[in-house]
């Protein structure tokens, strides 16, 4: 499937309910069989939407870059966000926080464009669920490597790894 017709744009407060729905749908799909089923079933679209409202209401003072992915019909099909690293021991100053896409957006090329827009050519780190083979393959293709950092998802204990992308000049 080609990327034709897919668009990126910054989110607005009016997008928060849809973002909450998409965010939870992506998690339920991507982490099925990886995270506990009861945890995924309990994810709240309303709480996610409220969290998005909170984030976006403070966004003007933040260097964080967040973009929505709109499919050819104009519906929200995902989002991505990056900003200053949150780790005290971060090997880079910039962190890719998230790239979340609904299944129909995967394989279209829009994830590459999204990553280019929110991270650019800078060095960056990210955390990814260790068992999320699809995401790890995407990040590896984009120059990220496992740098040895390990953590656990706070609510589930699911293993996470830190990946880093270095820029050679």
Model-predicted segments: where are they?
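Conserved active-site alpha-helix within GNAT-family acetyltransferase domains
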Residues: 108, 112-113, 131-158
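Conserved GNAT acetyl-CoA-binding A-motif
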Residues: 120-131
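Acetyl-CoA-dependent GNAT
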Residues: 6, 10-14, 21-34, 38-106, ...
């Amino acid at each position: 499937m080609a990327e034709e017709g897919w668009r990126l744009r910054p989110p607005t407060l009016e997008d928060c309910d849809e973002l909450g729905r998409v965010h939870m749908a992506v998690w339920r799909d991507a982490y099925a069989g990886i995270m506990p089923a009861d945890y995924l079933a309990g994810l709240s679209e309303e709480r996610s939407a409220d969290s998005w409202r909170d984030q976006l209401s403070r966004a003007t003072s933040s260097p964080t870059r967040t973009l929505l992915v709109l499919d050819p019909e104009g519906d929200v099909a995902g989002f991505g966000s990056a900003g200053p690293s949150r780790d005290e021991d971060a090997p880079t100053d910039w962190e890719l926080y998230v790239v979340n896409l609904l299944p129909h957006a995967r394989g279209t090329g829009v994830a590459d464009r999204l990553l280019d827009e929110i991270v650019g050519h800078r060095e960056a780190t990210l955390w990814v669920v260790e068992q999320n083979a699809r995401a790890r393959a995407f990040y590896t293709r984009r120059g990220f490597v496992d740098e040895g950092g390990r953590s656990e998802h706070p609510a589930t204990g699911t293993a996470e790894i830190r990946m880093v992308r270095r820029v050679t000049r």
